[in-house]
């Protein structure tokens, strides 16, 4: 299943045998896939770019960064693209705003994404040693991974950390989530901040400062919500 906000698309895939669940990977659309391929081959010759199966409506190629994080690479007009990825653009009041990953070498990876994809690089408001790259609408935050951030809770490996959304009215959003929970209790977000370990994990999330409201989806993927500036 694919959903989108008129600019960013997201695929929600069933978990198959041997595959991880959760926030698995992201994708980047470029104007010229071959130009990206040339930049990667020149500076990162050990990084491989492979063809994805033809039934993927969201990706033509698979690639990874120097830390091994896999992501999709696509270009408008490629024959395998379909669904929300070819539905055109539109504006809406609730939209994707960012995503974040925690990594051992944030500066190294920030330089990779900035150089290969020609994205402006800035310091992230998430804290010391964090970086942000944006195309003007969607932002990637690269956060330092430190084992001490997980003191008092379960330790998570360096990986994608959370999704971020921007809404026009945070109070209205919270009300809608509550109404959805009443209509269908199975749609209730997974509880966060429950017990000592849950509280420690939630506090780690809040320290990023990338949201005003924090929750998790039904599968446990962490989500940061922020109200749009008017």
Residue ranges, per PLM feature:
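Intrinsically disordered, low-complexity, compositionally biased regions/tails
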Residues: 8-10, 168, 202, 215
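Generic domain-boundary/flexible-linker signal
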Residues: 37, 79-82, 110, 174
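Vicinal oxygen chelate
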Residues: 2, 15-92, 95-104, 124, 132, ...
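Generic secondary-structure microfeatures
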Residues: 117, 146, 167-169
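Surface-exposed interaction/gating patches
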Residues: 91-138
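Conserved short beta-strand elements that form part of the metal-binding/catalytic scaffold
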Residues: 1-21, 63, 69-78, 120-157, ...
């Amino acid at each position: 299943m694919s959903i989108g906000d008129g600019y960013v698309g997201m695929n929600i895939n069933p978990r198959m045998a041997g595959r991880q669940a959760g926030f698995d990977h992201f994708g980047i659309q470029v104007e010229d896939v071959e130009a990206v391929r040339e930049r990667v081959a020149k500076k990162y010759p050990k990084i491989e770019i492979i063809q994805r199966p033809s039934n993927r409506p969201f990706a033509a190629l698979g690639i990874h960064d120097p830390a091994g994080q896999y992501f999709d690479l696509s270009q408008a007009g490629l024959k395998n693209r379909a669904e929300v990825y070819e539905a055109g653009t539109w504006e809406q009041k609730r939209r994707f705003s960012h995503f974040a990953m925690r990594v051992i070498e944030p500066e190294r990876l920030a330089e990779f994404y900035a150089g290969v994809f020609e994205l402006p690089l800035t310091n992230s408001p998430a804290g010391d040693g964090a970086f942000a790259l944006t195309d003007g609408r969607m932002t990637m935050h690269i956060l330092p991974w430190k084992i001490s951030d997980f003191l008092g809770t379960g330790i998570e490996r360096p990986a994608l950390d959370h999704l971020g959304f921007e809404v026009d009215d945070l109070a209205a959003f919270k009300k809608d989530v509550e109404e959805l929970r009443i209509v269908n209790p199975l749609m209730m977000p997974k509880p966060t901040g429950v017990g000592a370990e849950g509280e420690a994990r939630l506090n780690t999330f809040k320290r990023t400062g990338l949201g005003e409201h924090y929750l998790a989806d039904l599968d446990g993927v962490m989500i940061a919500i922020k109200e749009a500036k008017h």
